[in-house]
C-alpha cells in the first residue's frame, strides 16, 4: 500500500474514546497515525504500547539493593560471592570431594597392581589409571564449584587403599573390575545424596550442577563397567583375560 507523502499526517497524541459506561477501552495506547490512500480512502492506524508491567511490579534496582540480604560483606574472611548457599550444601560438596578423591586413590592402587612386572596387564593398568585421573578431575571440579558459590573447601582424610587384588576363584582381573563396578555405584549413591541435599535446601543451581556435570556420566560409567564384568565372566581366568587386556590397551 503506497502512501502519498504530502498527505500523510503527523503523529498526534492519543485521546481514548470512552466505551459503554464511560470506561476507556485501552488506557495504555499512546499514539495514533492517520494516512490517506488515493484508492482506499482515509485509514487510521493506532499504535499501542503498554505502560503497565504485566506482573504489576516495576523493577526498582536502587531501592531493592538496599535489602539486608544483598548487602556486600565488609568483614574479613567472608565470601563476597556467597548467596543462598546453605551450610548443609557446603558440607555436602566437601564430603563429595572426599568421595571422589578416595575413589581416585583406589583406582590408582589398581593401576599400580596391574602395572607390576609379574602381573603385566597393561590394558587394565591403563584403564584404572585413566579412571583415577577422572575421579581426581571430578574432585577438582567440585572444589572449583565450592569456591564459585562462596564456600570453603575442607579436605578430609583419605583411607588407605589395598595393594593386593588377587582372588583365587575369580582371578585378579574379574575381581578388580567387580570392585570398580561396586565403587562406581557407591559414588553414584553419594552423588544422589548431594542432589537431595540441594533439593532439601531449595538450591536449584547446585542441583543443576550435579545433574549436568556428574549424574549422566556416572550411569554411563556403570553401564560400561557392567559390560566389562559380564565379558570377563565369560572368558574366565585363562587366555581370554590377555585378549581382553589387549582390547583395553587399544
Curated annotation (Swiss-Prot):
One of its GO terms (biological process) is iron ion transport. Pfam families: Ferritin. Fe cation 1 binds at residues 100, 135, 138. Leaf > hypocotyl. One of its GO terms (cellular component) is cytoplasm. It catalyses: 4 Fe(2+) + O2 + 4 H(+) = 4 Fe(3+) + 2 H2O. Residues 83-236 form the Ferritin-like diiron domain. Disulfide bonds: none annotated. Gene3D superfamilies: 1.20.1260.10. It comes from the Eukaryota. GO terms for molecular function: ferric iron binding; ferrous iron binding; ferroxidase activity. Residues 50-82 are annotated as: Extension peptide (EP). PANTHER family: FERRITIN (PTHR11431), FERRITIN-1, CHLOROPLASTIC (PTHR11431:SF90). This is Ferritin-1, chloroplastic.
Amino acid at each position: 500500500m503506497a502512501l502519498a507523502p504530502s498527505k500523510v499526517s503527523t503523529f498526534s497524541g492519543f485521546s481514548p474514546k470512552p466505551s459503554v459506561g464511560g470506561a476507556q477501552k485501552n488506557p495504555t495506547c499512546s499514539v495514533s497515525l492517520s494516512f490517506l490512500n488515493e484508492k482506499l480512502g482515509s485509514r487510521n492506524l493506532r499504535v499501542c504500547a503498554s505502560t503497565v508491567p504485566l506482573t504489576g511490579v516495576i523493577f526498582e534496582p536502587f531501592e531493592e539493593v538496599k535489602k539486608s540480604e544483598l548487602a556486600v560483606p565488609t568483614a574479613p574472611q567472608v565470601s563476597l560471592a556467597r548467596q543462598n548457599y546453605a551450610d548443609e550444601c557446603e558440607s555436602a560438596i566437601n564430603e563429595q570431594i572426599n568421595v571422589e578423591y578416595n575413589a581416585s586413590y583406589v583406582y590408582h592402587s589398581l593401576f599400580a597392581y596391574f602395572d607390576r612386572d609379574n602381573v603385566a596387564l597393561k590394558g587394565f593398568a591403563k584403564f584404572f589409571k585413566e579412571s583415577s585421573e577422572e575421579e581426581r578431575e571430578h574432585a577438582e571440579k567440585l572444589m572449583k564449584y565450592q569456591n564459585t558459590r562462596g564456600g570453603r573447601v575442607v579436605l578430609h582424610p583419605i583411607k588407605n587403599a589395598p595393594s593386593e587384588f588377587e582372588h583365587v576363584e575369580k582371578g585378579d582381573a574379574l575381581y578388580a573390575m567387580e570392585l570398580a563396578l561396586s565403587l562406581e555405584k557407591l559414588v553414584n549413591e553419594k552423588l544422589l545424596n548431594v542432589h537431595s541435599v540441594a533439593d532439601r535446601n531449595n538450591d536449584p543451581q547446585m542441583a543443576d550442577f550435579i545433574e549436568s556435570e556428574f549424574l549422566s556420566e556416572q550411569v554411563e560409567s556403570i553401564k560400561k563397567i557392567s559390560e566389562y564384568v559380564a565379558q570377563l565372566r565369560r572368558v574366565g581366568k585363562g587366555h581370554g583375560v590377555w585378549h581382553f587386556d589387549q582390547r583395553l590397551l587399544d
